[in-house]
């Protein structure tokens, strides 16, 4: 009786030892066929043609557009209840961070030097005003509203 039980266990283990190495072979072939080589697409830098003055002007325009949207609501809670407006602000925040990154990568410290067309005080004043309204564009598309 014990012999039959041991024989069944032995047969089961032998069966698993033979079958298990081949169990995963079919899945790998299917996965390899299904995978399409991914081509990394570099995002188009829409701000690449701007100079320092253009960067400042574009940043102020984005801040002004965002402020206009925010000011069309009495409270931040009212703004949050309108998904379309929230999406517009997130899109502007994303554009703002892309602009900052692009301009900083090209001009580095030059964007921090005030000039007639690079009015850093106005930019900071508008950014602070928007921040006081509850929107921090520097957070980009991760902006919490």
Predicted regions located by residue number:
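C-terminal motif of bacterial Sec signal peptides marking the signal peptidase cleavage site
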Residues: 21-24
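Immediate post-signal-peptide N-terminus of mature secreted/exported proteins
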Residues: 28-71
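Residues embedded in well-ordered secondary-structure elements
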Residues: 13-14, 44, 92
